[in-house]
């Protein structure tokens, strides 16, 4: 079973009932291309997902070994005890971005992250949210070329299942491949941010997403 692409519209009304939420899984837009485990080795994910144009995208990231990979179709790792986590979102790029992550407005990433059917928007709209840092970096590809990543730091107040507001901090690393934005989110409760900042930053900076080259079939004589 695969997830449908993430919709970026924001719900205007109130929260969904807890009973309804228990029957659903957060929609991430991730469509994995393999049924095997994405764990390459302990603390390392290596997998392929489908982009908007149908092509395969190789994704990888590292995480602390005490974190666990969540079951199900999503790429989601977490420290269950402390609520630290990292997960991947995939969404079609805005048409006017022309395939460039630099041209995507910052609000787009927040709309995807806080979509009503997502991890943080499921219990109600996330109205209190703030971008504290944002920049574009160029990272080397194996070919020697460069690939742009939008890197952001945010703070926000999502609702919990019992309708309490909790402050969280997150780091976002996003790049564009195959007509999709691949958005990697690493975060924790705000009261833990100073303590685990370096750990989260290592996870955040480890994320890579690159197009997979497919060999053309040999021509017949």
In which residue ranges do the predicted regions lie?
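N-terminal targeting sequences that direct proteins away from the cytosol to non-cytosolic compartments
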Residues: 1-149, 156-167, 176-221
